[in-house]
């Protein structure tokens, strides 16, 4: 079952989060969006967006057990010589000559890397860091894409000739989220600032996570008794600033949104809870017995 | 005679009416209206619920379960609060093959949780569709971090699935009683 969709309704960050949390292995391809002239209805039954179908592939990411291992984008030269040049490890002339030679000898990236290390042009660390930088820059670019169709193929592997550098997605998600913050999008993601936050159940999710000063300030106030609005006030942040930080923490799986234990001050548009009908156990058991026996032909 | 009620909610065209039709012992009392032929909605389906759907399951002479389906279109959301009043629990239907409706599904879920903190389950509908997302992916997409919340595969036209979804909701209600 392929995971298909459109970045207009399921963003790159959300996709990376899904792949990270479910520890997927496979390839994610982003396609050019080809207009169909038709509209697509969103779940509210009134908002319409352009319906696009997949055209030519524009970018591809590969994952292994939830880690990003490879990225290529049509608009970014992914040859190892170019990657090393962009990260300042080779000059333009060196890059051009090495590329020419590698192409003449039909060398793979792996073979070329070995030759460059043996010739003391670069170190293994230089190569890994340069590829990481290239990969991450592709992901950050993808995070700004807003409407392209995508497809995730389970088990699909990266080209064998390429150098795979595993990258933890959580820090990318946090950094990428900082880059792509847009007020409107954030309001859609976190419509209700009267919700509270609590830390994720699994404390191991905090390992290797780097937080900024503002994020630490917010983290200090995380408690199911404090609404997001109250945290923003305590930290002297605007709604957008707090949304930015909470969104990043949510996407990285560090916190969860919960109803506040002590009711936060209501916004005027929040409706009052309706009375609850408390059933007794006998009623529920009788319902279960009845429903188990229903065998109606549709 | 005691009556109890459950609410079937979810985004536009997620399969709420079909779900109730599949298990109700009576012909569903529906308030469906035709969608304008040229509209985008009409590409999805020809009719939409404007007030509610109503189904019934008679347990015995003393007990009846009513199933209320909410209108999917936001412009009829004034009905939601009315329908939520006194519910035992609710089912959030999601069309697993339409990621464009996931955000709305999450918003509806949060709204109903705000109306009443009753147990609920999420039905990952249209699992027979080629493009359907798996329930475990939907859990992440809908940000349902609480593993106690059941996210169940569903095909709203198939009685087996519908029965299972309602049973799981009832089990959740029992579990909540136990925990209290």
List each language-model region with its residue ranges.
Chain B
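Conserved C-terminal guanine-recognition region of P-loop GTPase G domains, centered on the G4
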Residues: 94-147
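Canonical P-loop GTPase G-domain recognition
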Residues: 128-180
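A structural signal for isolated positions on well-ordered beta-strands in alpha/beta enzyme cores
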Residues: 7, 121-122, 150-152
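Conserved G1/Walker A P-loop phosphate-binding module
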Residues: 1-46, 55-58, 64-66
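Conserved catalytic network of the ASCE P-loop NTPase/AAA+ motor domain
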Residues: 49, 58-61, 81-86, 112-116, ...
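Inter-motif core of Ras-like GTPase G domains
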Residues: 75-98, 111-115
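Switch II (G3) loop of P-loop NTPases
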Residues: 59-77
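Loop/turn-to-beta-strand initiation segments
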Residues: 62-65, 88-89, 118-121
């Amino acid at each position: 079952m392929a995971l298909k969709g459109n970045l207009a309704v399921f963003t790159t960050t959300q996709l990376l989060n899904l792949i990270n949390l479910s520890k997927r292995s496979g390839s994610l391809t982003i396609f050019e969006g080809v207009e169909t002239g038709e509209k697509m209805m969103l779940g509210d039954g009134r908002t319409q967006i352009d319906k696009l179908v997949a055209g030519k592939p524009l970018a591809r990411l590969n994952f292994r057990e939830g880690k990003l291992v490879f990225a290529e984008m049509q608009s970014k030269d992914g040859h190892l010589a170019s990657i090393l040049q962009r990260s300042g490890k080779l000059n333009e002339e060196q890059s051009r000559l090495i590329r020419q030679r590698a192409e003449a000898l039909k060398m793979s990236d792996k073979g070329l890397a070995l030759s460059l290390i043996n010739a003391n042009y670069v170190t293994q660390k230089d190569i890994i860091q340069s590829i990481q930088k290239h990969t991450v820059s592709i992901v950050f670019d993808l995070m700004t894409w807003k409407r392209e169709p995508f497809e995730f193929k389970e088990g699909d592997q990266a080209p064998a000739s390429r150098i795979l550098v595993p990258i933890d997605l959580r820090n990318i998600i946090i950094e990428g989220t900082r880059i792509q913050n847009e007020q409107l999008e954030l309001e859609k993601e976190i419509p209700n600032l009267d919700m509270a936050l609590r830390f994720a159940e699994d404390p191991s999710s905090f390992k290797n996570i780097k937080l900024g000063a503002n994020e630490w300030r917010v983290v200090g106030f995380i408690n199911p008794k404090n609404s997001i609005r109250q945290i923003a006030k305590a930290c002297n942040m605007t709604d957008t600033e707090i949304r930015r930080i909470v969104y990043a923490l949510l996407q990285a799986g560090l916190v969860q949104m919960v109803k506040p234990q002590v009711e936060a001050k209501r916004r005027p548009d929040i409706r009052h809870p309706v009375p609850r009908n408390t059933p007794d156990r006998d009623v529920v058991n009788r319902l279960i017995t009845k429903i188990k026996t229903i065998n109606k032909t549709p | 005679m005691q009556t109890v009620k459950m609410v079937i909610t979810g985004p536009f065209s997620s399969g709420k009416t079909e779900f109730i039709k599949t298990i109700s012992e009576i012909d569903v009392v529906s308030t469906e209206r035709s969608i304008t032929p040229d509209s985008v909605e009409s590409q999805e389906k020809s009719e939409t619920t404007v007030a509610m759907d109503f189904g019934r399951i008679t347990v015995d002479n003393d007990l009846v379960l009513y199933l209320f389906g909410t209108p999917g279109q936001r412009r009829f959301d004034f009905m939601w609060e009315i329908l939520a009043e006194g519910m035992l629990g609710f089912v959030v239907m999601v069309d697993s093959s339409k990621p464009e409706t996931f955000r709305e599904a999450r918003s509806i879920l949060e709204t109903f949780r705000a109306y009443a903190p009753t147990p609920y389950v999420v039905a990952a509908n249209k699992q027979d569709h080629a493009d359907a997302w798996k329930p475990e992916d939907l859990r992440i997409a809908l940000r349902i971090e609480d593993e106690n919340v059941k996210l169940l595969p569903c095909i709203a036209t198939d009685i087996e699935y519908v029965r299972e979804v309602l049973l799981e909701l009832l089990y959740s209600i029992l579990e909540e009683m136990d925990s209290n």
